[in-house]
Amino acid sequence: MALVLSRKPAILLENDGDYRQIIFEGKTVTKSLFADIENCAEFTKVTIPENVVGVRGDAFEEFVNLQEAEILGYVEGVERSLGTVATLDIDWKDPAVLAEHLRSGCYVEIKRAMSWRDWN
């Protein structure tokens, strides 16, 4: 399990194609859901409102190719890189720490270096 919502509205998951999925209050975002999106496009944008209250498990850490992913987010209204998973100083298994990073901006964009197609 990856994300837990406290109240409405929802998380919007989308790629640079036409694939979109809305996650409403109370639904848990699982690794398999991210894997479904990963199979659709190279870029996955996760729009996360400030109502995210916790992150459980290591679904982000184990997401395909996320070890090399660049994490982008808004900090004080300005988009900037938060680093890569390999170098980012975040305890991914600590819900409070990751949730605070998610709250620091409007979204976190998972940008993978290689597509799943590159491995096939």
Short names for language-model regions:
Residues 1-31, 40-54, 64-77, 83-120:
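Structural signature of tandem-repeat unit edges
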